[in-house]
Swiss-Prot record:
Pfam families: CD20
Alphabetically ordered keywords of this record: Membrane, Transmembrane, Transmembrane helix
Record protein name field: Protein ENTREP2
Lineage: Eukaryota, Metazoa, Chordata, Craniata, Vertebrata
Annotated region (Disordered), positions in chain: 312-452
Low complexity bias spans: 357-366, 379-392
């Protein structure tokens, strides 16, 4: 016998139908339990009353009519019914049904016999106490009207005299026989109900299996076989419905959208420029000021340019308004000459070549002072003279140098545009418009080492701000709104205040690099 908690042997294919139906429905299980218990109680009563009646009489006819055998069969049937409720095996249920059917017939016969004998005892009213060899026996017979004794022709009943009054013993036997008759009738009814229920259960399971093979098991929530028992049924994967998938996850975007920027009143209409091809965005919409994607690494962009780059002189623009004449800022104008050019650098650059020394340091030549441009010359003439002046040499920049310049042509191309803007401001007379300087100031050129520290190269914030300000100055129109001019002026003032610190940091880094 397998253990209570261990696995059990699977059942045959014909068994699960009746078992699962009985196990799945607690109502039918309770009915089977009630019928089994009732049969056990009735069987015990029939056996007890039958033996009591046998003890009161010695007559063979009465003794043979006491249905104690029916009581034993009913008791056994009730016991099988309780077992079928505890262990709902198809074999046990079938045996319970057959035994209940047998009990119906036995109880029916016992009830008939007990009732006949009870009527016989009630008809024998004349009882006498007779002694046979020191043995007392009560003899009951049918009374005759013309005689007071019992005739030998009629029926006689011999009773065991438990007391001197034989009539009391006869009445007790009569009551016991009628009680046995009533108990047999009740047992017949109970056994018939048990037989009908078991038969209907098995037939219904067979019919469901025949007409509905895929729905033979009850779909009621109260009729479910617990997992791990012998009645556990295999899941039907054809009726399995997969759960709904979770909603897709979209990561948050921490960028400024054009819709949000449109509420600020910042409407810029810039012309197309190489800056859009460099950062793969368009610069004619407010959203491009805050690109959703980060710009490409500086090393990747510089890697597309040739190894040796041309050094150029930064163009210095003096911007002053009528309201604040003391405010001045120097900005470079990074207009690339080709698609592979880089933004121009701020500050001073060296025009002489750098020659490495034998010990690994760099030897810087004597800085050259550019020829100042006279004030009476126009910007176009100044640009032509700057182009005609021969360059003493070129500076070999590092690949990772963010201050690399393209050529002097990129600087000279922005001067006619600034002159045109100045001419329009002077003609309109707007006090809030910007004015360009009368000329470029001579600037002392500082020597820069061949290689820059990586800490300066990785400083993307300053480089990006410088490029953004340069693009504002490059594409600035004379008819910009007041708000835009205020924003540009603020950025220029901040960049101007930070220019000396940046130059000192670059110079210090160059000295440390030489050491």
């Amino acid at each position: 016998m397998p253990p209570a908690g261990g696995p059990r042997t699977p059942r045959p294919h014909a068994l699960p139908r009746s078992l699962s139906r009985l196990r799945e429905c607690p109502g039918r299980s309770r009915i089977v339990l009630a019928l089994g218990a009732t049969q056990m109680a009735l069987g015990c009563l029939i056996v007890a009353v039958s033996f009591a009646a046998l003890a009161l009489t010695t007559s063979a006819r009465v003794r043979h009519s006491c249905p104690f055998w029916a009581g034993f069969s009913v008791l056994l049937s009730g016991l099988i019914g309780v077992v079928s409720w505890k262990r709902p095996l198809s074999l046990v249920i079938t045996f319970f049904m057959l035994l209940s059917a047998v009990c119906v017939m036995l109880n029916l016969a016992g009830s008939i016999l007990s009732c006949q004998n009870a009527q016989l005892v009630s008809s024998l009213e004349g009882c006498q106490l007779i002694k046979f060899d020191s043995v007392e026996v009560c003899v009951c017979c049918e009374l005759q009207h013309h005689s007071s004794g019992c005739s030998n022709l009629g029926e006689t009943l011999k009773l065991n005299p438990l007391q001197e009054n034989c009539n009391a013993v006869r009445l007790t036997l009569k009551d016991l026989l009628f009680s046995v008759c009533a108990l047999n009738v009740l047992s017949t009814i109970v056994c018939a109900l048990a037989t009908a229920m078991c038969c209907m259960q098995m037939v219904s399971a067979d019919v469901l299996q025949m007409f509905f093979p895929h729905r033979s098991h009850s779909a009621n929530a109260a009729c479910v076989t617990p997992h791990g028992t012998i009645l556990h049924q295999t899941l039907d994967f054809d009726e399995f419905i997969a759960p709904l998938p979770p909603p897709p996850y979209y990561p948050p975007e921490y960028t400024c959208t054009p819709t949000a920027e449109a509420h600020r009143g910042l409407h810029l209409d810039f012309a197309s420029s190489p800056f859009s091809t460099l950062y793969d965005v368009a610069i004619n919409s407010p959203g491009i000021l805050y690109p959703a994607e980060l710009p490409p690494p500086y090393e990747a962009v510089v890697g597309q340019t040739p190894a040796s780059q041309v050094a150029s002189v930064d163009h210095q623009v003096v911007d002053s308004s009528s309201g604040d004449p003391n405010t001045a800022a120097d900005f470079s104008t990074p207009v690339p000459a080709s698609s592979t050019s880089l933004p121009t650098s701020e500050g001073a650059t060296s025009l002489g070549p750098s020659h490495p020394s034998p010990d690994g340091t760099l030897d810087t030549p004597t800085p050259l002072i550019p020829t100042p441009v006279p004030h009476h010359m126009s910007p176009e003439a100044a640009s032509l003279s700057a182009q005609a002046q021969p360059s003493p040499g070129r500076v070999a920049r590092s690949v990772s140098d963010p201050t690399s310049c393209t050529s002097s042509e990129a600087v000279s191309t922005s001067q006619p545009a600034m002159a045109a803007c100045q001419h329009q401001h002077s003609s309109t007379g707007d006090p809030d418009t910007w004015k360009t300087g009368q000329g470029t100031k001579p600037e002392t050129l500082q020597t820069v080492s061949k290689e820059r520290p990586h800490s300066l190269v990785e400083s993307k914030a300053y480089a990006d701000t410088r490029v953004l300000v340069a693009k504002f100055l490059e594409h600035a129109h004379c008819s910009l709104p007041t708000e835009v001019r205020h924003v540009v002026g603020t950025i220029r003032s901040m960049a101007t205040s930070e220019e000396p610190r940046v130059e000192e940091a670059i110079f210090g880094a160059g000295v440390l690099d030489q050491l």
